[in-house]
Amino acid sequence: MSAGGAVPPPPNPAVSFPAPRVTLPAGPDILRTYSGAFVCLEIVLGGLVWILVASSNVPLPLLQGWVMFVSVTAFFFSLLFLGLFLSGMVTQIDANWNFLDFVYHFIVFVFYFGAFLLEAAATSLHDLQCNTTMTVKPLLNDNQYNINVAATVFAFMTTACYGCSLGLALRRWRP
């Protein structure tokens, strides 16, 4: 208690906590922007990469394990990112969302570019022969090769979408 017996009023939260810094709209309006459309494409194409690599039975786990990790992780984080904007939580969480958007898309772009290169390298090993105890057989059969070609194409398209999102995020972060 103060000397006068009155309790000081609590601080105004609007003064204590600055408003979040975000230039993208929250709620369903995010889907009407280029960034929202790219995030939706990233989710769909990244899911296809994940499904295609998994359906090839991962014949080269050293190379394709990283591709699976990146595609699954990026898929779920992109869903979380889109969910935060669709639910409007970005307006209630004090953060520089423009900077976080840029950092997220930069990291995922770098990782997805590496995953694309590894998937392309795994696909290029189609004609490589593998010695077993009885016979010599190709490392990838024709079905696995076709699936890996499709996964490589979709990994490239997903990488391009993350690159476009990175460019848009850079423009928002540094106008």
UniProtKB/Swiss-Prot annotation:
The chain crosses the membrane at residues 34-54, 66-86, 102-122, 149-169. GO terms for cellular component: apical plasma membrane; membrane raft. It is a multi-pass membrane protein. It is found in: Cell membrane; Apical cell membrane. The keyword Flavoprotein does not apply. InterPro entries: MAL (IPR013295), Marvel (IPR008253), MARVEL-CKLF_proteins (IPR050578). PANTHER family: MARVEL-CONTAINING POTENTIAL LIPID RAFT-ASSOCIATED PROTEIN, PROTEIN MAL2. Member of the machinery of polarized transport. Required for the indirect transcytotic route at the step of the egress of the transcytosing cargo from perinuclear endosomes in order for it to travel to the apical surface via a raft-dependent pathway. This is Protein MAL2. It comes from Mus musculus (Mouse). The gene is Mal2.
